[in-house]
């Protein structure tokens, strides 16, 4: 019909940061506060219709994300680049949209992803610290040896059947995972463990960390740790590490429309760096609030 504007479907990708403490995970659940539901509701408010947001990873309740990736489809003249401001004006304080861009309809936040990277953080001082408590496991009961923990992680590199670190309730029909890299290092009173894989099993990182601390504290041998996951002894993995220490750090794609500056590779290290910084100096004379010398 003459004068009618044709509207074509477009796919919008988002880079999302959130604090997981007050969420019941990423994925929509009835009568629960979830990240997916909050963002879907905000988008629906603008478009006047329901949408489905597809995430690269389904983080558990209490798990944080520095750069979760998701996409949704719309038939709207709104430019994809505007969704950062549109959504941030409507979302709660514990969710932040860091980037938005149009992607091909063949691109998928979950199925186009080649890898995901998680970081788990321990805080090992005996006295608690309120500024890092929401983002780390306060583990001070026994000294942790990060070099032993790294040695335990090394055999995980490659493609393995990791049923020992697979929680019940998953819809995934297999437990094969290709672990691409692991890194465990100390930063003052903090120990950071990073693991990158093509995908992760339900609850995998927290179960792995829960067993790994037994190696780091000298309660379990390297050989026994390896034997447990190689023989798929799920019953031997009794404890999952607290969710608050875990952060989805980054998702990797062959083609991605966002600049590298959106990746928070330093997250959550930036916070811990400030806590550790003893070189801060303060002027003798106080300045008015908001002013610097």
UniProtKB/Swiss-Prot annotation:
InterPro entries: PsdUridine_synth_cat_dom_sf (IPR020103), PsdUridine_synth_TruA (IPR001406), PsdUridine_synth_TruA_a/b_dom (IPR020097), PsdUridine_synth_TruA_C (IPR020095), TruA/RsuA/RluB/E/F_N (IPR020094). Keywords: Isomerase, tRNA processing. The keyword Isomerase applies. The keyword ATP-binding does not apply. The active site is at residue 60. Gene3D superfamilies: Pseudouridine synthase I, catalytic domain, C-terminal subdomain (3.30.70.660), Pseudouridine synthase I, catalytic domain, N-terminal subdomain (3.30.70.580). Substrate binds at residue 118. Its EC number is 5.4.99.12. GO terms for biological process: tRNA pseudouridine synthesis. It comes from the Bacteria. It is an enzyme of class 5 (isomerase). GO terms for molecular function: RNA binding; tRNA pseudouridine(38-40) synthase activity. It catalyses: uridine(38/39/40) in tRNA = pseudouridine(38/39/40) in tRNA. PANTHER family: PSEUDOURIDYLATE SYNTHASE, TRNA PSEUDOURIDINE SYNTHASE-LIKE 1. Homodimer. HAMAP family: TruA (MF_00171). Formation of pseudouridine at positions 38, 39 and 40 in the anticodon stem and loop of transfer RNAs. Belongs to the tRNA pseudouridine synthase TruA family. This is tRNA pseudouridine synthase A.
